[in-house]
Amino acid sequence: MKKLAWVFGKSSDFSSTLMSEFNKQGISTFGFGRDNVDYGDFDKFIDGKVVPDIIIINANIEEQIALVIDNKNFLDITLQKMSNMFFNYTPVFLFFTKLIKWLENSNKETTVCGISSSITAWPQQNKQFVMYAVLRSMMQQLVYSASSNVCNAFCVSPSGINATNTIDYAKRVAQLITDKTDLKLIDLTIEEEVVNLQR
């Protein structure tokens, strides 16, 4: 039986390339995005769905909503602005929380890969983007929480992605899935793990 992959964030070039790579490997692939998923209604989404073998989370809402806070504008950041940021993140985060718990209940051998950012390993290098790092870290923790005796869960950071390396990055993600990578954040640019929770 063919393996099944779900790719969330299908509109991005990287997601499209990943889906193409999966198809080449004989993996049935379904892409999900805002045009066919209501992130505010998990029950409607999951109704009648078969548990996939692979889940790719590439929603990338964090970049759109994260506040930029530096040593010049920090006094202008209000409680309302901070609340709005988390409020806008909540539907997507809750959706994926429920998805991970649904997987947990299925007890099926699955791999979860979060397309993320390595900024969570060194937030001090880009201090003004600390809220972006915080949001990315939230999703990374959720992905890692899926790890179990039947589920592998890891994140990759496709930093420096461009037209010349997208296919290579997609092939590497597919290989990491094949290798049953677990509890790691791997930066595809430097080809190294920057976080390893198995240590």
Task: Identify the role of each PLM range.
Residues F8, P52-A66, F87-N88, C113-G114, ...:
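Rossmann-fold scaffold of SDR-type NAD(P)-dependent oxidoreductases
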Residues F14, D38, T120-Q124:
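Short, solvent-exposed loop/turn segments at secondary-structure junctions
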Residues T17, E21, K98, Q141, ...:
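Rossmann-fold NAD(P)-dependent oxidoreductase module
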Residues F30-K44:
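Rossmann-fold cofactor-recognition segment
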Residues N73-F95, E104-N105, E109-S147, S159-N162:
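Catalytic loop of short-chain dehydrogenase/reductase
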Residues C151, C155-S157, I161-R199:
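C-terminal helical subdomain
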